[in-house]
Amino acid sequence: MDSEAVSSDSHVAAAIATRRRSNSVSDDYSVQRTNDDATQCKYFATQKGYWKDEFISRFANSSSNVSEARRFPEISMGYWARTAAIEKYVRDFLNEFDGNAQVVSLGCGFDTLFWRLVSSGAKLVKYVEVDFSSVTSKKIRHILKPIGPNSVDLKKSFESDAVVSHHADLHAGNYHLIGADLRQANELDQKLATCQLSHDIPTIFIAECVLVYMSADSSTALLKQIVSQFKQPAFVNYEQFRTSDAFTKVMEQNLGDRGIQLHGLEMCESAEKQEERFRNAGFKEVKVMDMNQIFNNFLDQKEVSRIREIEMLDEMELLQQLFAHYCVVSARI
């Protein structure tokens, strides 16, 4: 799970696959590598039957082995809960407005939600993905690469032929993939303008372990930028939570060993801190749930029961500890 770690006495402490965001261009390679790690973990989880995703294989290396630490059930369960939660928020939003809505994924990595939505018949106006150019250029190559005997053609989900510009941007009617630094307001504005997003219709922004790599000032500025430009924005943010204990120190140490700094960790200390950030940016309705609440109350409990049976855990303490240190923030104006 991206930047997910557990306490130092846990066997999952080494299972950290992080989509990192940093202040240096030199860290782009690390971001790309950790995105690859996360994709492999998701691919492994889907192969175990946690959820169906016929598209993830286009981005994963099926010949690459997932490390033993990343094979632990807690990691796969964590990825499932996170993936299911974000998808539910987005589907509920699209259904609320009968598909007359847009989705913007910030720090998208190799996420496949667009294809999962469209293949299931979900209606939407536009789906825009944003990440560093080093990531989007690689994603474009995966999207456009020749189709293998057992692979799906990702281009079939597009409303029009894909047009690639500057090797890092792709535009295809209902789908857009753009390379931009989320901390650079002008760059982000210019790139979003090429997607011809409507600022007047409901738009949901999603971010998974993204804001935590930005300074508090930068993430708040991004949120204010969204509120000022879109009439009906919603935001769903997944990231670290309760970050003042030993659990987080272990995570920071693991990330620090790989040259990664969590510049926005102070905003993840508590629900109050998260609410304060979003309210200061102009969001009025803000709700914070940790992943234990998401797992036990928000997600389909029939699915939760099925997930529990895939790889039976001897005890739930480790998973509960992991879930206690991640949350979902949902916000509207």
Swiss-Prot record:
Keyword Disulfide bond set for record: no
Gene3D superfamilies: Vaccinia Virus protein VP39
The organism's place on the tree of life at top rank: Eukaryota
EC annotation from Swiss-Prot or TrEMBL: 2.1.1.233
Keyword vocabulary terms for this entry: Methyltransferase, S-adenosyl-L-methionine, Transferase
A Gene Ontology term for the protein's cellular component: cytosol
Chain sites annotated for binding S-adenosyl-L-methionine: K42, R82, G107, D131, D181, L182, E208
Keyword Amino-acid biosynthesis listed: no
Catalytic activity from the UniProt record: [phosphatase 2A protein]-C-terminal L-leucine + S-adenosyl-L-methionine = [phosphatase 2A protein]-C-terminal L-leucine methyl ester + S-adenosyl-L-homocysteine
InterPro entries xref list: LCMT1 (IPR016651), Ppm1/Ppm2/Tcmp (IPR007213), SAM-dependent_MTases_sf (IPR029063)
Any Gene Ontology biological process: regulation of mitotic cell cycle spindle assembly checkpoint
Enzyme class of the recorded protein, top EC level: transferase
Protein family membership: Belongs to the methyltransferase superfamily. LCMT family.
Name of protein: Leucine carboxyl methyltransferase 1
Gene name linked to the record: lcmt-1
